Amino acid sequence: MSKKIKAIGFFVTAILVFAFACEPEMLYGTAKVAGSTPAGTNYEYGYSVCIDVTVDDQGKIIKVSDDEKNTEASIAADVIGAAASNKAYWKKYLSGKGFEKYKNLTIEDVKKMNVGFPGAPGVDAVGGATAASLAVKNAVLQALVLDASIKKLVNYKNPDNYKKGEQNKLEKIIKEGRAHLETLETYEEIEKALAELKQKLDALKTK
């Protein structure tokens, strides 16, 4: 094989690797629609928002969507007999272009968003749909924080720095920890669990 052909082959491979690395990633997030000024934080409206979050290779949001209408399906399940009003508020959120507020934001940007609380809307809430606004923010954060936390957990330690016995413990903590993170409902729970898992990994003895 000529040097020219080899060079072309390496160039094409490099392009493919770069393109794959820069390909957008779609994450999934969900959060219960909850909270009421008179009833408190534990009040639930009987449905969950279920959204997709597309991010670029830097973790910046490209798009938040619910193209499969999973939230509407959750509303239709009508576990508390409030489907009609829930559907109206969700429609108001969508018509208020709530998803567009997340374009180009990072995890930290989303955390800083002020959607307020049902009954006391913030500047980033969709008017008349504060509960939905809060739930979407929580769902977006759940998706982003879960993805980031799993990546941090997997890459937190280098297995080559441990003897075989400790390597096995490392792999076990990561495997079980990842499974646990995926069961958690809120981004706060995920962040707390990741910190605890890091402590377990820090306790392992290196070579």
Give the positions of each predicted feature.
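Active-site- and interface-proximal helix/loop "cap" or "latch" segments in soluble metabolic
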Residues: 26-151
